[in-house]
C-alpha cells in the first residue's frame, strides 16, 4: 500500500519545469528502462543523468575513480521527462540506478520516502568531505527536514546571465548590453530591435515564461520581492515590490517575442536561428551556445539590475541571480552502497570539482574552486556567470516540500497565464500577483 501511495505522490511531483537546471535542450533520449538496472549482477555501477553535454566530462572523472577502485561505471543519459518516469518506476517497485542526480523539485519527496541512501555515517568517516566547503543552499536542499540527515552531496551550482547576438545589434544599430544595464535598458533595446526587425521576423527579446529560474524569478528579487521566503513557509509575490518587478517584466513582454511564438519554437531555437537578439540563460546551457553555428556572434553580460534606489548605480540587493544545485544521490537499495558512496565522494572531492569546472562541465558545488570554469570556453567570455556571485547577490531557487504543486498552478488559468498571453494590461499582471500569493500560501498550508 505504501508503494502505491508513493507512486501516486511521485507522479504528482514529477511534472517538473524545464527551466530547472539542465532542461530538455541539452538532454538526450539514449536512456532506456534497461539503463535503470543497478550494480547487482553486473559488476559495475549504473549512473543516470539527464544532460548529454555533461556526459564526456563526467565519464572521464568516473573513469579516474575506476582506476583507483577497480569498479566500472556506466553513465546513462536519459532525457529529462523519461529520467523522472524511470526513476519513479524504480522507486515504486523496480530497480533504481545505483547513483543519480537529485533535484530541488523532488528531493524532499524522495528523502521522506526512504528511497535515498542516508549518507551521514559515510560523511562522518570521510576526510575528503566537509559540508562547510559547499554552497549552503545546495547542502540544505538535500538535508531531510524531519531527521536532519544528508541524502545527497552537492554536484554543482549555477547562475544566470544575459545572452545577446552582436550581429543583430549591429544590423539594427543598437548598442550592445553592458553590465551597467538596467531592466529598463533591456526593455528599450528590445523595443528598438523588435520595431526595426518586423520585416525580418526578428524580436529584441524572448523569454519562456514557463522557465522561472532563468527567467522571471530574478526580476522579482531585484525589486525586493520573494517567491518563497527564506524559511520556505511563505511568499511575498503579491507585495508592492514584487508587483513592481512583474510590471517591468510585463513591459518587456510587450516588446518581446509573443508567447505563442516562444511556445512553438523555444527561446534557444529562436536565438540560434537569429530571430531574437537577447535571452537569459543558465550556466548549464553554455555548451549549447558555444557549439552553435554562429557562436562567434554571441556574448554574455551579467543580468540587468533594478535601479530601485534611483541613483544610477547598482547597489547591493538590486541585481540578483537565482542559483540551484544538483545533488549526487544513491539508491537506498543499491547492491553496493559502499561503492556508490565512494563514487559520490569522488565526484564531490576538491580534485574532481576542480576538474569538472576546468572541463566546462558545470560550475562546482564546492565553494572557491570554479576559477577555471570561466576559462573553459576558448573564445567566449563566460565570466558573467562567476561574477554574478562575486559582484551581485544570489538567491537559492525557491522551493518548498512540494514545489511542483504551486509552480504548476502559477502557469495555469488563475495564475499568470492570462498575464503571459496578454501583456498589454497592467491590471491583469497585478491581479495575477495577488492570485499567486494565495496559490502559494494555500499550497504551503496543504503540505
Task: Enumerate the language-model features and the residues they cover.
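Short, low-complexity disordered leader/linker segments with a strong preference
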Residues: 1-45, 67, 434, 438-447
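Short, well-ordered beta-strand elements
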Residues: 33-36, 41-52, 71-76, 98-99, ...
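A structural signal for short loop-to-beta-strand junctions that line the ligand-binding cleft
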Residues: 90, 97-98, 128-168, 314-321, ...
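Extracytoplasmic/periplasmic substrate-recognition and gating elements
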Residues: 63, 68, 72, 148, ...
Amino acid at each position: 500500500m505504501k508503494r502505491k501511495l508513493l507512486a501516486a505522490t511521485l507522479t504528482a511531483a514529477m511534472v517538473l519545469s524545464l527551466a530547472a537546471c539542465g532542461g530538455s535542450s541539452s538532454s538526450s533520449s539514449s536512456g532506456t528502462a534497461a539503463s535503470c538496472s543497478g550494480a547487482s549482477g553486473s559488476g559495475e555501477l549504473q549512473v543516470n543523468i539527464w544532460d548529454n553535454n555533461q556526459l564526456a566530462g563526467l565519464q572521464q572523472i568516473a573513469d579516474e575513480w575506476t582506476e583507483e577502485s577497480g569498479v566500472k561505471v556506466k553513465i546513462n543519459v536519459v532525457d529529462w521527462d523519461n529520467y523522472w518516469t524511470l526513476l519513479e518506476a524504480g522507486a515504486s517497485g523496480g530497480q533504481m540506478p545505483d547513483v543519480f542526480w537529485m533535484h530541488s523539485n523532488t528531493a524532499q519527496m524522495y528523502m521522506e520516502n526512504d528511497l535515498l541512501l542516508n549518507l551521514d555515517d559515510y560523511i562522518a568517516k570521510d576526510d575528503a568531505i566537509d559540508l562547510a566547503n559547499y554552497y549552503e543552499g545546495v547542502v540544505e536542499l538535500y538535508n531531510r527536514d524531519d531527521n536532519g540527515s544528508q541524502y545527497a552531496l552537492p554536484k554543482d551550482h549555477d547562475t544566470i546571465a544575459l545572452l545577446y547576438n552582436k550581429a543583430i545589434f549591429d544590423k539594427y544599430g543598437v548598442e550592445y548590453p553592458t553590465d551597467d544595464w538596467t531592466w529598463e535598458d533591456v526593455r528599450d533595446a528590445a523595443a528598438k530591435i523588435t520595431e526595426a526587425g518586423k520585416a525580418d521576423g526578428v524580436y529584441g527579446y524572448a523569454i519562456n515564461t514557463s522557465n522561472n529560474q532563468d527567467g522571471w524569478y530574478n526580476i522579482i528579487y531585484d525589486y525586493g520581492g520573494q517567491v518563497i521566503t527564506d524559511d520556505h513557509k511563505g511568499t511575498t509575490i503579491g507585495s508592492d515590490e514584487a508587483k513592481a518587478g512583474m510590471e517591468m517584466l510585463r513591459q518587456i513582454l510587450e516588446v518581446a517575442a509573443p508567447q505563442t511564438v516562444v511556445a512553438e519554437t523555444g527561446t534557444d531555437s529562436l536565438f540560434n536561428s537569429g530571430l531574437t537578439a537577447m535571452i537569459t540563460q543558465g550556466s548549464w546551457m553554455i555548451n549549447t551556445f558555444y557549439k552553435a553555428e554562429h557562436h562567434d556572434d554571441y556574448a554574455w553580460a551579467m543580468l540587468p539590475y533594478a535601479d530601485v534606489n534611483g541613483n544610477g548605480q547598482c547597489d547591493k540587493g538590486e541585481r540578483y541571480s537565482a542559483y540551484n544545485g544538483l545533488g549526487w544521490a544513491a539508491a537506498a537499495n543499491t547492491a553496493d552502497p559502499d561503492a556508490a558512496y565512494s563514487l559520490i565522494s569522488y565526484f564531490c572531492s576538491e580534485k574532481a570539482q576542480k576538474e569538472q569546472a576546468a572541463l566546462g562541465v558545470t560550475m562546482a558545488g564546492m565553494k572557491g574552486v570554479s576559477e577555471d570554469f570561466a576559462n573553459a570556453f576558448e573564445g567566449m567570455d563566460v565570466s558573467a556567470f562567476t561574477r554574478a556571485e562575486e559582484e551581485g547577490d544570489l538567491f537559492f531557487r525557491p522551493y518548498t516540500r512540494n514545489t511542483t504543486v504551486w509552480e504548476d498552478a502559477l502557469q495555469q488559468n488563475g495564475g499568470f497565464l492570462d498575464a503571459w498571453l496578454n501583456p498589454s494590461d497592467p491590471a491583469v499582471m497585478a491581479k495575477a500577483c495577488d492570485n499567486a500569493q494565495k496559490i502559494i500560501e494555500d499550497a504551503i498550508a496543504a503540505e
